[in-house]
Amino acid sequence: MIDRRGSPKTPAGGLLGDTAFRDYSSKLQAFNAFAEPELRRAIAALNLAPGMHVLDAGCGTGEALAWLHEQVAPNGTVVGVDLSAAHLEAARDHLRPGVTILQADLLGAPLPVQSFDFIWCVNTIHHLREPLQGINRLASLLRPGGRIALGQSSLLPDMYFAWDARLERLTNEAVRSYYRERYALDERDLTAVRGLLGLLNRALLQRVTIRTVVIERTAPLRPADGAYLHEAIFRQTWGARLRRYLSPADYAELSALCNPGHPQFALRRPDFHFLQTFTVGVAEI
């Protein structure tokens, strides 16, 4: 059952137009399957203990709910909160005894203060127009001595085309141009994720630490890797919407690299080498 007590009657759009009706489900599921080894290791390194009460703030399609619950079972609990109804429908697949989900805006979720021992929040805080306000709200939900972990992918630009840094740079610039136009953002908005450490310090939290790992994939790829790169990146993040931001020749070359039916399809190249950073900042209340 999905608890909708916190659902906004008139959802306010987030920085990237997020509302209760926004659906990134396929992209989130693809990312979580792709990055599962690294995400699981990041969670295991947090030294959670059985019996802890955990909040997954911005739980998306819910894959991490089960991973977190494994760390606090048998008598711990995990609550997942997300604004999107579609995401929480997908998260149903990960429900089990001790795991619940709630549809709500993070800033207005009907959760008691000082009710959690640990908060996990990945690729979420910078969807808010006021990230610092979001961190302060989450911190208020922690018990004394509780910890919050903010995870963020891609603090550094991802590497897709190791053999062609020029096309990679132009593609990344085209993506930024699209987001600037589509969501009326400026360059500071688009690079704000790099300020994760500063945000935690500005929130006046204690014992702030930060660690970055590299998600690295080379040919031959696992099916989950290929699905994420082709569907979530090549098709959904890039695709036809980048046409207007690239020259005809560059767009044609990019299209060939992203097309499974083309002889130049990037994911079949023996020299395919992908790098993405994943950063986790941890702080104590």
Predicted regions and their residues:
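A short SAM/SAH-binding and catalytic strip from SAM-dependent methyltransferases
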Residues: 117-132
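A short glycine-rich, Lys/Arg-flanked "PGG" loop and its adjoining helix->strand segment in the class I
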Residues: 132-147
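Class I SAM-dependent methyltransferase SAM/SAH-binding core
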Residues: 55-57, 61-109
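Core SAM-dependent methyltransferase catalytic element
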Residues: 203-206, 276-285
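Conserved class I S-adenosyl-L-methionine
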Residues: 1-50, 63-67, 87-90
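Conserved catalytic/acceptor-binding region of the Class I
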Residues: 150-221
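C-terminal helical/coil "lid" or tail adjacent to the Rossmann-like core of SAM-dependent
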Residues: 3-4, 10, 14-24, 170-171, ...
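A short acidic, Gly/Pro-enriched loop at the edge of an enzyme's catalytic core
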Residues: 108-118
